[in-house]
């Protein structure tokens, strides 16, 4: 068997869906699904942009190390 390759399989599936949910409820479900997908894509895009704008943690650690080393050198020179 080839699965759902026949048009009649799809017709039966659609009839079952209409019987389960009703003709009025299907557009509401589709609208909700579409808005959910849209919100998900927007959230993924926002997270990607946020990740690009964040400073790298390695760079921040290197800067802190340089500041610490510089302050140690100054304190030794003053002593």
From Swiss-Prot:
Self-association and partners: The Tat system comprises two distinct complexes: a TatABC complex, containing multiple copies of TatA, TatB and TatC subunits, and a separate TatA complex, containing only TatA subunits. Substrates initially bind to the TatABC complex, which probably triggers association of the separate TatA complex to form the active translocon.
Keyword set includes Nuclease: no
Annotated segments matching region Disordered: 46-79
Family recorded in the similarity comment: Belongs to the TatA/E family.
UniProt xrefs under HAMAP family: TatA_E
Membrane topology, from the record: Single-pass membrane protein
InterPro entries: TatA/B/E, TatA/E
Any Pfam family: TatA_B_E
Name the record gives this protein: Sec-independent protein translocase protein TatA
UniProt-annotated location(s): Cell inner membrane
Transmembrane segments: 1-21
GO molecular function (one): protein transmembrane transporter activity
Domain of life: Bacteria
Biased composition annotated in UniProt, kind: Basic and acidic residues: 66-79
Predominant place of localization: membrane
Chain's role: Part of the twin-arginine translocation (Tat) system that transports large folded proteins containing a characteristic twin-arginine motif in their signal peptide across membranes. TatA could form the protein-conducting channel of the Tat system.
GO BP: any one term: protein transport by the Tat complex
Encoding gene per record: tatA
Keyword line: Cell inner membrane, Cell membrane, Membrane, Protein transport, Translocation, Transmembrane, Transmembrane helix, Transport
CC annotations in GO: TAT protein transport complex
